Amino acid sequence: MANPIRKLVDNSKKQLKKLNHIADKVEDYADEMAALSDEALQAKTPVFKEKIADALRDVTETDKQNKVLAKTLDALLPEAFAVAREAAKRVLGLYPFRVQIMGAAVLNDGNLAEMRTGEGKTLTATMAVYLNALTDRGVHVVTVNDYLSARDAEQMGQLYNWLGLSVGVNVGDAPAEEKRAAYDADITYSTNFNIGFDYLRDNMVRRAEERVMQRGLNFALIDEADSILIDTARTPLIISGPGSGVSQLYGRADRFVKTLQQDEDYKIDEEAKTTMLTNDGIHKGEIFFNLDNLYDAGDTALTHHIDQALRANFNYINDKDYVVQDGEVKLIDQSTGRISEGTRLSDGLHQAIEAKEGVEIQEENKSMAQITYQNLFRMYKKLSGMTGTAKTEEEELREIYNMEVITIPTNRPIKRVDYPDLLYPSIRAKYNAVVKLIQELHEKGQPILIGTGSVESSELLSKILMAQNVPHNVLNAKNNAKEAEIIANAGQRGAVTVATNMAGRGTDIKLGPGVADLGGLAVIATERHESRRIDNQLRGRAGRQGDDGFSQFFLSLEDDLMIRFGAERIRAVWERMNLDEEETVIKNRLITRSVESAQKRVEGNNYDTRKNVLQYDDVVREQRELIYHQRDIIIDESQSLDWVLMPMVSRTINRVVTVQTKSKKPSEWQLQQIIVFAENVLVNEGALTENDLSGLSREDIEAKLYALAKENYANKKRQLYEPEQMLEFEKVVILRAVDQHWTDHIDALDRLRQGVGLRGYGQLNPLIEYQNEAFENFNKMIADVEYDATRTFMKAEIRQNLKA
């Protein structure tokens, strides 16, 4: 049996050999490009574009086009990369290193380049972006926030503009015209959030010219790809409309759970992040709400509100999971430490937290359109990404996105020292040790970056440092306005920076004068994050580009991660070694391995959650793609939609006639009901009598009704003198029916997904149950769309002054 470790090593060597070969080819062009004048170098862009156009000129089939295009880009890669490289030197004063060429080749292949902090990912991307922008199909450079989109577009846009390519920035609240212009550019910088919502909104428009993304999804290059493809994947993008108001049960449920005692009335499951009532708690609930049975089948709304109130009060912590700002509950992205603006928890949980915090409870919204980031990015013809940390999630990236994670060598050897974790018996003892080390390092002027797990922890440590007269800056979700400035100065002599996870990404920390002689940047972490990637990002802040530096993690048995997964086992070791003194510390690789084992369990749970979200969205995906495709056909039609509308009429007639003539005896057929249907939906009252249908076969009845409908259609066509008016009328009728029933369907599926998990208690597979009901509901929705479109069109009264 082959050794899997050996296989991975061999595969890695093979990949690096291929990348080195590509880098050789690019570097072979270096002297030739350096000898060109600016005009000659700039003239390469139209030459490349012409070569691509020539290769695709006689290819019409889409799949074949994509293959020819990929082959053409591979052939152009060495020279195009060399052009972009030389242009970067002239325009930006930066000349990509060999390892950056290798990283760009990985990106062009549709894979993920893992490059250490400070290795120049932004410059690396320029070569792959330039090559793929030559196709005139659009390149989307995806970032985690609007600030980075604007910054990178401004900095790198100088290079692209110089090479004759246009650059656009898609900002969240920009008008549609500006968004359209940004997407029409050769290269578009945008956040994943903006692209996702623009895609959903584009599939809700009624006119082709209202779309902002006119070219579809071609090539996406994602910066901080692990954050976008992994960390945000648990939360689907949802466009909502007004709901049915605010339930009074939120306040009542919140008041009830605040009367309960832990362990006696409820038990908290830290691992699953849920809280359940005990028998005593259930009894108290029955008294509080004056009920005989709290879990009566007819009172599921109340129990749902109680469940959410329990989670809100005991699983979601202020200043850790969310903050309250300006009278609103705002979520904190646990992977970045930043506020997730505009994001709300679903299923009434956000409202339960609002009730807990005593702020205005906003009404629940109705889901109108939704998609997961997984399915959004899987729609791109080519997807690539770059980040400093992704190897730990390689399996998920391969399985979900079909991307390989390829680690790019550093330009200089890494000199940073990562010390083993230090474990203390209590949080107090841990903080004492942290502050002691900070004071020692600060006295000699060595810059220190202290990573904390939450806003609450950062503020606690800040208070301790203030009491010890240690000057410092604090960076967290409440104080992110000066993020770039604070992080940029964090490497200066004497700087002490306390930060949440937001310090792990974005702006580089460059060492100030004399800092290298002091040992470089010191990274101190006050706890382990539940993801190894986040820890590695924090470590990677020290030792960039071969700088000196070190990282040290301080843990305690009272940390959240330890309580959830590792504390009991480690406490047993503690007791066997008689280490019960408050200041005792364990410094052992075994502790580090135990913690990493706990992290792997959390990562596994999180992966299962993301996979579960995707499995449910995959059920909707086929339906969504079908509906969106049909909408596009209707919107883009330029002649007539009779070929869409009349088959809808035919199928509607067939469904009604089939139901009303299901008896084998024609004498038992419900002919009067068919006439009622015809008068309500197809024709004017009195246009059809029972005698007209008596004696006819089922097929003849359908043919009779269809002939009347066809005649009605022809009359309307004559009444609307201009073909454009008829087409516009058809579009409005069909799209209104589709949109109304599709949004109702999406909302129903959302509610089904939230409740279907309970069927697991009945030994049923919730996902299969969801699939079956979603399929049945979709077929019913199609029938409802066709019925409404038929009725609206056939019963509409056309007036001479009608403007569609």
UniProtKB/Swiss-Prot annotation:
It catalyses: ATP + H2O + cellular proteinSide 1 = ADP + phosphate + cellular proteinSide 2. GO terms for cellular component: cell envelope Sec protein transport complex; cytosol; plasma membrane. Signal peptide: none annotated. Monomer and homodimer. Part of the essential Sec protein translocation apparatus which comprises SecA, SecYEG and auxiliary proteins SecDF. Other proteins may also be involved. This is Protein translocase subunit SecA. The gene is secA. Keywords: ATP-binding, Cell membrane, Cytoplasm, Membrane, Nucleotide-binding, Protein transport, Translocase, Translocation, Transport. Part of the Sec protein translocase complex. Interacts with the SecYEG preprotein conducting channel. Has a central role in coupling the hydrolysis of ATP to the transfer of proteins into and across the cell membrane, serving as an ATP-driven molecular motor driving the stepwise translocation of polypeptide chains across the membrane. It is an enzyme of class 7 (translocase). One of its GO terms (molecular function) is protein-exporting ATPase activity. HAMAP family: SecA. It is found in: Cell membrane; Cytoplasm. Belongs to the SecA family. Its EC number is 7.4.2.8. It comes from Leuconostoc citreum (strain KM20). The keyword ATP-binding applies. PANTHER family: CHLOROPLAST PROTEIN-TRANSPORTING ATPASE, SECA INNER MEMBRANE COMPONENT OF SEC PROTEIN SECRETION SYSTEM. Pfam families: P-loop_SecA, SecA_DEAD, SecA_PP_bind, SecA_SW. It comes from the Bacteria. GO terms for biological process: intracellular protein transmembrane transport; protein import; protein targeting; protein transport by the Sec complex. ATP binds at residues 100, 118-122, 508. The lineage of its organism: Bacteria, Bacillati, Bacillota, Bacilli, Lactobacillales. SMART domains: SecA_DEAD (SM00957), SecA_PP_bind (SM00958). The keyword Zinc-finger does not apply. It is a peripheral membrane protein.
